[in-house]
Structures are given as C-alpha cells and as structure tokens.
Amino acid sequence: MTVFNKFARSFKSHWLLYLSVIVFGITNLVASSGAHMVQRLLFFVLTILVVKRISSLPLRLLVAAPFVLLTAADMSISLYSWCTFGTTFNDGFAISVLQSDPDEVAKMLGMYSPYLCAFAFLSLLFLAVIIKYDVSLPTKKVTGILLLIVISGSLFSACQFAYKDAKNKNAFSPYILASRFATYTPFFNLNYFALAAKEHQRLLSIANTVPYFQLSVRDTGIDTYVLIVGESVRVDNMSLYGYTRSTTPQVEAQRKQIKLFNQAISGAPYTALSVPLSLTADSVLSHDIHNYPDNIINMANQAGFQTFWLSSQSAFRQNGTAVTSIAMRAMETVYVRGFDELLLPHLSQALQQNTQQKKLIVLHLNGSHEPACSAYPQSSAVFQPQDDQDACYDNSIHYTDSLLGQVFELLKDRRASVMYFADHGLERDPTKKNVYFHGGREASQQAYHVPMFIWYSPVLGDGVDRTTENNIFSTAYNNYLINAWMGVTKPEQPQTLEEVIVHYKGDSLVVDANHDVFDYVMLRKEFTEDKQGNPTPEGQG
C-alpha cells in the first residue's frame, strides 16, 4: 500500500480529526499570533488523541468539556478581534473585557452573534471528534507521554522566561509565568487575560495612593464645576458640528454660552485607556498606571473642593479598574443602573450640599455605547425607524443632548460651569452587520475625533472665554485643562485655560488598540477609506 493510499484511508476514517486540526491551524495562523504554533498544534492534537482513548464516556466528556470550550472560546475571540478591528486580540482588549459589567457584556454578545455561532460550531466540531472512542489510534500511554513532554517543555520555557523577567524587575510575577505558558497552549489568548489580571493587581496596589501636591489655587469666580464624560460619541453625528439631522438642539441653543473645541481628539479609541489619559497625568508616549493617582479628583480634594462621581456605567468590579481607581477617590460616589437621566436627581442633591463649598461633580455617562438602540428610553426616540442603526445612534446623541439641556437648566442661576467631552469616537461602516464599532489597529480619525466644549452660566457674564478653538487639542491633556479650569494647578503646569491650550494645541499623537502610536493627522479620515485615504469599494457610493 502506497503512502498516499495509507493517508487516504486514514483521512477517510478520521476526517473529522483532520478537519479540526486544519480549522485550528488556519484560524490561529490568520486571526491569532503565530507564536509557538508548533507547540500549540501538538498540544491540541495530542490532547484530542489522549481523550479519544479514554474508554469511559462520562469521564471522556468530563475531561473533554473544559478543553473543548476553552479552545472554541479562544478561537472565537481571535476571529472577533481580527474580523472587527483588523488586529489580533491583545491585553488592551482583555482589560476592556475584564472591566465590562455583565449587562454590557450581554448587550455586546447580542450584537456579535456570528461569533457566538462560531463558538457553537467549533465546540460541536471538537466534541464530535472527541466523543467517539477509537482503538485504532495510538494508545493513551504513547500519546500521554508525548503530551507530557510537550507540556513539560513548555513549562520549562515559560519558567525560563519568568526567571529572566524577575531578574530584570527584581520581582517574580506568577502572572508572567501563566501568561507565557498560555502561549504554548491552544488557549493562547489566556496569556492576555493573565497580563490583564496582573494590571488589575497593580491597580489595586496603587488605587489608595494619594500623593501630596504643591498646589496653586486661584479664584476663578466659579463655585460649581460639572464635568461630563460622554461615551462613544461621534462628532460626525452631531448637528453642533454640522450634521444634517438636528441631534443637538439643546447645546446649540446655548451656543453663545459655550467655548467649543472643533478638533478635539481622544488619546485612545477605547475607554479603559482614554479616560485615564484624560483625567490623570498619564500620557500617550509614557503610559504608566503609576501616573493614575495624579488625577483631577485627588487635586480637587486637596484644594478643598467637595467631590462627587456620579456614573451610569455599572459599579461592577468597582476596585481594580482604571476608571474606578480614579472615581473611588471622590468624597461621594453614586452608580445608577439604567439610563443616564437617572443621574439628574443625584446631581440635584449634590448641588444642595454645602452651598458655600466649591464642588467638582463628575458625571460619567453611558452615552452612545453600543448597542446604541439600548442607550435611551424608546419613548425618547425622535428619529425613525427605531430598528435602524443610524437612527438609533442619532437618537442616543439626541438623548444625551436632552440630558445636557437639563443640566444647563439646573445650573443657569449659579456661578457654575460645565465641561463636556467624549472618551472616544466610533468607526462607521454601513456594509458591516454592526455599523458602529470601536477603533482597532490603525483606526481612522473618526475613532478619535470627539466633541468637547465648556459651558459657562449666564451669571458669570462676559468675563470668561467663550471663543471657538479650531486647533487640534488632545483630551490626553484634559487633566491640565481641567486643573486650569478649576484654578487648581501645580507650579510646573500652565496656569490658565488659554495657557494650556496654547502649550498643547497641535499635539496629535494617539495610540491604537494595538498599543502603537500614530499621528492623528496622518490617519485616514474614515474607516471606509484605505490607508492612503482612497474610498474602498465597499465604502463607495
């Protein structure tokens, strides 16, 4: 019998096994990192062969279940990241997943049903391969020894890597060991979750750190500062910036009271990094979570302000996330479950407290986070049809505008000011199932271009700057802008809003979802353009 005939006979008998190996290999080569591919493939094949030789069906299924589910989940995550963002999964995505609350995860899963189907298909495929006991395959002893050799070699290599890391950093990290070992297994993406868990522990260790600042405090004539952080807001969908639909009538009605930033850009296209960049001393080029304690809340506290953090983004995992490490420093924190308007009663209560004391009140909105159709009450919809994604997104913008109008109404008779900006923008591609989505690798300008303005109460008169700023200004410098806005600065910082803007305008460096730094100006304007700025075939017409 020729080699070809032997192979054909083997393929006919074990075609599901061959198919699963091919699917596993191609998926990991295309949508995941190719690192340690030989070890991962051997681990996958040998595990299947070992399990198939377990004679007891209940025991075989018990052993197979975690392997099958983890492998299918890992591959589905890789496919999601590659197909949606054009990049492999990484620790930044893992951090975002770990910092998402269950409600948000459930909503997002509903949007990405193809990847749930991929998970189900892969699980069934691998289970179909494993479920049949097959005596024609090599014995458990042979495959078990080979699998043990692969695991031992991988563990030894991971230990070597962790030892070198510990030697360089003078500290051993079990997360580094776990992360490295995962790269040799079919569960490659677990390495990113191990790194995210390491970041979580680092955040826990520094969250309670309160630095002492040498502060310069000046009287701005303002007693109440309301900082509103929007979520996933596109400038291109706001009539304030020229959009054809009237999505921002309340803000436009206040145009004479507003200092508008026409070219504000976010430092990153996802919340877990963009918000800390905006509210702390962290920076695009020198990202380090040890910068997080140097934040606007700690500065305001030391300056004698009463501080509040009111959020409609779930309190799930309140400790150990980037945003909550800042929020927890506020004197009062409130998390509501529901639509953004539920924050308004808490804002009213905060305004009534200690009326003689200066206040910084932060409202962290759910805004236009995907899925936008769930971001507002259906009774608030003004654009139809309500199941159209563009209408839903525009309704979410209109809903936020309505909330801003109510905030202005609460503050119009006070010596108050409101700063509003969005954490990041969103991409738009009408050819995709989910038209709006976060920026990924080498995101377009739309993922970064955000709305930003400062509203001043009419009570403050004409002594404040309401001119329009047309230069690029990165929200990565908003901590300095907010400090100057409050009149609470460090000696080495620009002291006034004008000084901050003059000093940092034009700095257009941004980081993408792959942690690579780009010049915003050089990015394609829209997602549907290629990297040279030409419309793609799908984006034409």
UniProtKB/Swiss-Prot annotation:
Topology term for the membrane:
Multi-pass membrane protein
CDD domains noted in UniProt:
LptA
Ribonucleoprotein is among the record's keywords: no
A GO BP entry is:
lipopolysaccharide core region biosynthetic process
Where is this protein localized, as stated in its record? Cell inner membrane
Q: Which UniProt keywords apply?
A: Cell inner membrane, Cell membrane, Membrane, Transferase, Transmembrane, Transmembrane helix
Residues exposed to the Cytoplasmic side: 82-110, 163-264
Q: Which domain of life is it from?
A: Bacteria
The record's section on PANTHER family has: INNER MEMBRANE PROTEIN, PHOSPHOETHANOLAMINE TRANSFERASE OPGE-RELATED
Q: What protein name does the entry list?
A: Putative transferase YhbX
Supply the gene name.
yhbX
